[in-house]
Amino acid sequence: MLLAAMCLALLGCLQAQELKGHVSIILLGATGDLAKKYLWQGLFQLYLDEAGKGHSFSFHGAALTAPQQGQKLMDKVLESLSCPKDLVPSRCDELKGQFLQLSQYRQLKTVEDYQTLNKDIETQVQQDGLWEAGRIFYFSVPPFAYADIARNINSSCRPHPGAWLRVVFEKPFGHDHLSAQQLASELGSFFQEEEMYRVDHYLGKQAVAQILPFRDQNRKALDGLWNRHHVERVEIILKETIDAEGRASFYEEYGVIRDTLQNHLTEILTLVAMELPLNISSSAAVLQHKLWAFQALRGLQKSSAILGQYQAYSGQVRRELQKPDGFQSLTPTFAGVLVHIDNLRWEGVPFILMSGKALDERVGYVRIVFKNRAYCTQSERHWVPEQSRCLPQQIIFYIGHGELGHPAILVSRNLFKPSLPTQKWKEVQDQPGLRLFGRPLSDYYAYRPVREQDAYSTLLSHIFHCRKESFITTENLLASWVFWTPLLDSLAFEVPRPYPGGAENGQLLDFEFSGGQLTFSQQQLEVLIPDLGSVPKPSDFQVLGARYRQSPLITAWPEELISKLASDIEAAAVQAVRHFGKFHLALSGGSSPIALFQQLATGHYSFPWAHTHLWLVDERCVPLSDPDSNFQGLQAHLLQHVRVPYYNIHPMPVHLHQRLCAEEDQGAQTYASEISALVANSSFDLVLLGMGTDGHTASLFPQSPTGLDGDQLVVLTESPFRPHQRMSLSLPLINRAKKVAVLVMGRTKREITTLVSRVGHEPKKWPISGVVPLSGQLVWYMDYEAFLG
């Protein structure tokens, strides 16, 4: 029967057309929800598209279920398959009959089952006089099952040399960078990179799949517009009306950021932001350009995100996971994240990623909003959509649902008339009364697909045709997790804002962005956290003054502490410029000062940057462009946002003559000479220090005498942490400063804070204890967690 079906299927391509070989497609998890809803229909669509074009096919549905029961379940799914509306019914019946005959169920549970499958495929190909082109294994199973299945395929089910193997995986691909690395390493031990296809089904959605072709086909119109000079912002949005009921186990582990932002929305972001390769048909070029886009993403801070949770969620978790009555989940079901890209094209343009459950509508879209610099002298009633520059200018890739109800591409008529392939996209008829993004539909050139197709049908076709650009490579996957993991870690204990769900949300989740920060527009009056007692807010405490090691101590919650320190630095700067015409500020690197840099960049517009010289307290011996470089952190979070003359910026010369911190290059002496030449008496106006958990400060470390005394102003040191080589201001130079501020933040600093408060002047054991300005002032800035624990 199977042979007869194959002969019938190949009848159309036997006339003078050479056969292209046999393809076996094995769907693992063939009776699961994803397979029932999308994958079998997608495989049927693949057969409809490819029947008669030279390949022969066999489809194997596989699961752990016993053969008889599994076949029964699979047959029920196959009977419900449908053809496109434009396919003649008789042709549909014919092809569906062939597909059913070519599809069979088999149990894949043991090594022997995989060996039997391999033998059956080889026997079938030989008996039918065919040659094997390749095999596709689609893993529609939970990730914990990947390793065993991969091992069995690799050992028992690979095709003979000359035939290809393609293995397809569904997310999640880990829950952070480390777990993603581990999974990638495990799969990489069984399969080559070119054999693996990681699915993000949003890349198969028609509007998303059209982003790169649209940019390519409209290069002439977009070349001058697709950049920071013309784009005001980019919104990448996915809203759902449903909640997480029935999926509490999954959602508690992943939450909304891992579920949608880290994958779907980030992949879309790269399609919008990446540089266009010369040939978008080259998978390798597209994937490389996407990777470069990942590498240009500015690191996220806690302040880059806002979180919410619909009010019924914790109750659902308690019921589904048998949690105690008082359990309150911190898992967010809503998130907005502000992303910036540090390159010439997108510098300063906010990319807003937002997704959530239990919202007011189901809709997904990508919206590029252009700056409006026009002023129109006539009243709005005389504005003509095709001509008036005062009307909003935007391009929208409408993913689906919402008021429009279907995928679409919308371009404001006052921008340009886009070019799209007419065989795939057609103009949308106007719908009077329908308004999208503040304008009537008639204000747009609007296009929709000639034939709507689900994402999995598109992706299965791309797998078959080896179009890797629609999938996620190991390198791009890990780059995404490198970007998202620090934010996820910083938000792990953040309490999300509760919201009622649906239309009742009102303006509760509206948010605003400024600089690198997102904040809710509406202040929340009350946060209910059952059984956790009263949770203090920063506003409940004032900035407190005290003394620490005989010097002034400022303590506060982090937000108030950073604000106070920034104000004190500005006051010192204004005073120095008033008296001496310049302000010399030496800054430390690391994570603690980042919030300070951001505060200075976004909240201190009277700061005398034009008269400020910026120096580094210490630097890692890496290129200045390296993410580990202290200068790179300063550049990302401060320098690019303020107007400091470039000749007033003094990075440490750690990279000379193609070498890093080589003593013979005399980088430390060069920096010392520069300080002596520009800073009066080598006395900085203000030095900002931190304190490590081992008592180190700058890059002066315990049990190392380097830089603790003597005449050297700048020294090379060795750190116990990677990268080991450092350059640092010496303790004698630091102590010449007019003011030294030590910033100490976080619960992990509590132990060293207590210890240092009790020791005397012991810089060899605790370098921070050697910070005693000769004639200047030392002030400690500590948050409550560092000071009180």
UniProtKB/Swiss-Prot annotation:
Keywords: Carbohydrate metabolism, Endoplasmic reticulum, Glucose metabolism, Glycoprotein, Hydrolase, Multifunctional enzyme, NAD, NADP, Oxidoreductase, Pyrrolidone carboxylic acid, Signal. In the N-terminal section; belongs to the glucose-6-phosphate dehydrogenase family. The gene is H6pd. Residues 539-789 are annotated as: 6-phosphogluconolactonase. PROSITE patterns: G6P_DEHYDROGENASE (PS00069). Optimum pH is 6.0-8.0. This is GDH/6PGL endoplasmic bifunctional protein. It catalyses: D-glucose 6-phosphate + NAD(+) = 6-phospho-D-glucono-1,5-lactone + NADH + H(+); D-glucose 6-phosphate + NADP(+) = 6-phospho-D-glucono-1,5-lactone + NADPH + H(+); 6-phospho-D-glucono-1,5-lactone + H2O = 6-phospho-D-gluconate + H(+); 2-deoxy-D-glucose 6-phosphate + NAD(+) = 2-deoxy-6-phospho-D-glucono-1,5-lactone + NADH + H(+).
